C-alpha cells in the first residue's frame, strides 16, 4: 500500500525507505536462494518455520490502522479488522501459531521490525527498492494510487499535472506522497502539499476546503466512495506496484515460511476468499513472490 499506510507506510534509512514507491516487476536478485526454494517445495509452511517461532508459539504482526478496507478498527471498538488482519490470522493458522496483532504508527513499523519488537508487518506497504534495503517482502497484493476530489471534481482535475499550483493533501511517509513529490518536481507552479496522518484525516481537508485533491490507494478510494457520495475518484492508477508482508532482513527462515503459507492459502482458495470478502479481489496476485517490486 502505498501508505504512511500512508503511506501507508518505514532511524534514517528506514524513514527514507517509507517514502518510496515501486512499479511491479521481477526483482530476482533479492529472491530466496534456489536451494531454499527447493527445500520449501516439499515442506509445509509450518515445517519451514524456524524453531524459535515454534517454541514461542506466537506470531507478532504490526499494522497501522486508517486504511479501510485493508486495516481499520471495527466501529465503536478497538478490534482490528480488514484484509490485512484477516490474512494475518490465516497465515498464523498455516504456521500453527497464535496471532498477536498490534496497531502502531506507520513510520515506526520498519524500525519495529529491525529492533525485534514485531515479527512481521502487514500494512498496505509497497514493496520498493529503498524499503528492501531494510526489509524483505512477501508480495501478496498489487495496486496503485488514484486521485480523489470532492464530488463533481470542481477544479476539473484530470491528471497529476493538473495538481500543479493547487493545495493537495497526502499521507505522510506514504508512496502516494512520493508520487506527489515526484510530480511537484516537474511543476512550474508548485503544489502546496499538506501531510496527513492517514487517508481519513486527509479527506477531512477535502471536506473543509483546505485541499482540493488527495492521492490514496485504489482499494481505499473504492471503499470511501462506496460509503459516501461526497467524493469522486479519477480512473487512472499511478505507481502500480506490489504490496508486501515485511520481514526483517535477518529473518530469512520466517520469510520463507510466510511465503509458503501465503502460497498454500492461494492454492486452497482461502486467500481469494478473504480479498473477495472485502471487495478487493481484483488486486489479487496469482502466486506468492518475494521482493518482486522494482
Give names to the regions the model predicted:
Residues 34-122:
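Extracytoplasmic small-molecule ligand-binding "clamshell" domains
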Residues 89, 98-162:
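Acidic, polar ligand-binding/catalytic clefts
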Residues 25-31, 36-42, 48-49, 175-193, ...:
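Ligand-binding clefts/hinges and TM-proximal coupling segments of bilobed small-molecule sensing domains
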Residues 125-132, 181-184, 207-239:
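A ligand-binding cleft/hinge motif common to bilobed small-molecule-binding domains
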Residues 19-22:
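C-terminal motif of bacterial Sec signal peptides marking the signal peptidase cleavage site
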Residues 85, 100-111, 155, 193-205, ...:
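Short helix-initiation/N-cap motifs at beta->coil->alpha
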Residues 24, 85-94, 153, 174, ...:
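Extended ligand-binding regions for polar small-molecule ligands
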Residues 65, 142-149, 218, 222-263, ...:
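Periplasmic-binding protein-like
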